[in-house]
Amino acid sequence: RQMCIRDRLYALRAMGHGDDLIIADTNFPSDSVARETVLGEVLRIDASAAEVVRAVLSLYPIDTFVEDAAARMEVVGAPNEILPVMQEVQTEVSAVNGPAAMMPIERYAFYARAKQAYAVIQTGERRFYGCFALRKGVVPPDQE
Protein backbone atom coordinates (compact mmCIF):
# COMPACT_ATOMS: atom_id res chain seq x y z
CA ARG A 1 0.00 0.00 0.00
CA GLN A 2 1.48 3.33 -1.02
CA MET A 3 0.76 5.64 1.92
CA CYS A 4 3.20 8.53 1.43
CA ILE A 5 2.36 10.34 -1.78
CA ARG A 6 3.61 13.74 -2.91
CA ASP A 7 1.88 16.14 -0.47
CA ARG A 8 2.63 13.89 2.51
CA LEU A 9 6.25 13.53 1.45
CA TYR A 10 6.54 17.29 0.93
CA ALA A 11 5.29 17.95 4.48
CA LEU A 12 7.65 15.41 6.03
CA ARG A 13 10.60 16.79 4.05
CA ALA A 14 9.75 20.42 4.83
CA MET A 15 9.62 19.75 8.57
CA GLY A 16 12.76 20.62 10.51
CA HIS A 17 14.35 19.30 13.68
CA GLY A 18 11.94 19.83 16.57
CA ASP A 19 8.80 20.18 14.45
CA ASP A 20 5.80 18.11 15.57
CA LEU A 21 3.69 15.86 13.36
CA ILE A 22 0.27 14.86 14.66
CA ILE A 23 -1.07 11.42 13.76
CA ALA A 24 -4.81 11.59 14.48
CA ASP A 25 -7.73 9.18 14.57
CA THR A 26 -11.00 9.81 12.73
CA ASN A 27 -12.64 11.47 15.75
CA PHE A 28 -9.93 14.12 16.24
CA PRO A 29 -10.92 17.60 14.95
CA SER A 30 -8.19 17.30 12.33
CA ASP A 31 -9.46 19.84 9.81
CA SER A 32 -10.01 22.69 12.27
CA VAL A 33 -6.79 21.99 14.19
CA ALA A 34 -4.76 21.63 10.98
CA ARG A 35 -5.84 25.11 9.86
CA GLU A 36 -3.77 26.48 12.77
CA THR A 37 -0.63 24.45 11.98
CA VAL A 38 2.33 25.57 9.90
CA LEU A 39 1.10 23.58 6.88
CA GLY A 40 -2.41 24.96 7.30
CA GLU A 41 -4.34 22.01 5.89
CA VAL A 42 -5.05 18.45 6.95
CA LEU A 43 -3.33 15.53 5.26
CA ARG A 44 -5.20 12.22 5.06
CA ILE A 45 -3.91 8.67 4.93
CA ASP A 46 -6.52 5.92 5.08
CA ALA A 47 -4.60 3.44 7.24
CA SER A 48 -4.33 2.55 10.91
CA ALA A 49 -2.42 4.82 13.28
CA ALA A 50 0.33 2.21 13.67
CA GLU A 51 0.72 1.82 9.89
CA VAL A 52 1.04 5.58 9.44
CA VAL A 53 3.55 5.86 12.30
CA ARG A 54 5.60 3.03 10.77
CA ALA A 55 5.62 4.84 7.40
CA VAL A 56 6.60 8.18 8.97
CA LEU A 57 9.39 6.64 11.03
CA SER A 58 10.81 4.99 7.92
CA LEU A 59 11.45 8.52 6.64
CA TYR A 60 12.66 10.43 9.68
CA PRO A 61 13.86 9.80 13.24
CA ILE A 62 12.18 10.92 16.44
CA ASP A 63 13.94 13.70 18.37
CA THR A 64 16.25 12.32 21.05
CA PHE A 65 16.90 15.67 22.76
CA VAL A 66 13.54 15.86 24.58
CA GLU A 67 11.48 13.43 26.67
CA ASP A 68 8.13 14.16 25.01
CA ALA A 69 9.21 13.58 21.39
CA ALA A 70 6.74 10.69 21.12
CA ALA A 71 3.48 11.44 22.89
CA ARG A 72 -0.06 10.09 23.09
CA MET A 73 -3.39 11.59 24.08
CA GLU A 74 -4.44 10.40 27.55
CA VAL A 75 -7.69 8.53 28.08
CA VAL A 76 -10.05 10.98 29.81
CA GLY A 77 -10.52 9.87 33.41
CA ALA A 78 -7.86 7.14 33.12
CA PRO A 79 -4.57 8.82 32.15
CA ASN A 80 -2.44 5.73 32.79
CA GLU A 81 -4.60 3.37 30.72
CA ILE A 82 -2.86 1.97 27.64
CA LEU A 83 -5.35 0.98 24.95
CA PRO A 84 -4.50 -1.51 22.16
CA VAL A 85 -4.09 1.29 19.57
CA MET A 86 -1.57 2.97 21.88
CA GLN A 87 0.33 -0.29 22.39
CA GLU A 88 0.50 -0.85 18.62
CA VAL A 89 1.96 2.62 18.06
CA GLN A 90 4.31 2.17 21.04
CA THR A 91 5.61 -0.99 19.35
CA GLU A 92 6.38 0.97 16.17
CA VAL A 93 8.09 3.77 18.12
CA SER A 94 10.11 1.32 20.23
CA ALA A 95 11.26 -0.52 17.11
CA VAL A 96 13.18 2.56 15.95
CA ASN A 97 13.68 4.59 19.12
CA GLY A 98 14.18 1.99 21.86
CA PRO A 99 11.84 1.06 24.70
CA ALA A 100 11.05 4.53 26.15
CA ALA A 101 7.31 4.98 26.80
CA MET A 102 5.36 7.63 24.94
CA MET A 103 4.58 10.68 27.06
CA PRO A 104 0.89 10.92 28.02
CA ILE A 105 -0.73 14.32 27.35
CA GLU A 106 -4.10 15.46 28.71
CA ARG A 107 -6.72 15.85 25.96
CA TYR A 108 -6.90 19.66 25.81
CA ALA A 109 -3.14 20.01 26.22
CA PHE A 110 -2.82 17.62 23.26
CA TYR A 111 -5.13 19.86 21.20
CA ALA A 112 -2.95 22.86 22.10
CA ARG A 113 0.23 21.01 21.10
CA ALA A 114 -1.42 19.90 17.86
CA LYS A 115 -2.24 23.50 16.90
CA GLN A 116 1.47 24.34 17.25
CA ALA A 117 2.52 21.36 15.08
CA TYR A 118 3.89 21.50 11.58
CA ALA A 119 1.13 19.26 10.23
CA VAL A 120 -1.74 16.91 11.06
CA ILE A 121 -2.26 13.57 9.35
CA GLN A 122 -5.76 12.22 9.85
CA THR A 123 -5.66 8.44 9.60
CA GLY A 124 -8.39 5.90 9.03
CA GLU A 125 -8.00 4.83 12.68
CA ARG A 126 -11.50 4.44 14.16
CA ARG A 127 -10.50 3.29 17.64
CA PHE A 128 -10.72 5.94 20.34
CA TYR A 129 -7.58 7.76 21.53
CA GLY A 130 -5.57 6.94 18.43
CA CYS A 131 -3.89 10.36 18.54
CA PHE A 132 -0.13 10.80 18.71
CA ALA A 133 2.54 13.48 18.37
CA LEU A 134 5.95 12.73 16.87
CA ARG A 135 8.69 15.36 17.08
CA LYS A 136 11.15 15.18 14.20
CA GLY A 137 14.74 14.48 15.11
CA VAL A 138 17.99 15.17 13.31
CA VAL A 139 18.35 13.37 9.98
CA PRO A 140 21.94 12.11 9.83
CA PRO A 141 24.13 12.43 6.74
CA ASP A 142 24.41 9.47 4.40
CA GLN A 143 27.16 6.99 5.23
CA GLU A 144 30.28 7.65 3.19
Language-model features: where?
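Short, small-residue-biased leader/transition segments that mark boundaries at the very start
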Residues: 1-5
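Short coil/turn connectors at secondary-structure junctions
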Residues: 8, 16-19, 39, 115-117, ...
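Conserved mixed alpha/beta catalytic, RNA-binding, or beta-rich assembly cores of soluble enzyme
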Residues: 19, 25-55, 59, 63, ...
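Short, conserved beta-strand segments within well-ordered enzyme catalytic domains
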Residues: 21-22, 120
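Short His-Asn-centered micro-motif
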Residues: 24-25, 123
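Glycine-rich nucleotide/cofactor/substrate-binding loop typically near the N-terminus or early
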Residues: 40, 47, 53-88, 92
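Glycine-rich, aromatic-bearing surface loops/beta-hairpins
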Residues: 77-144
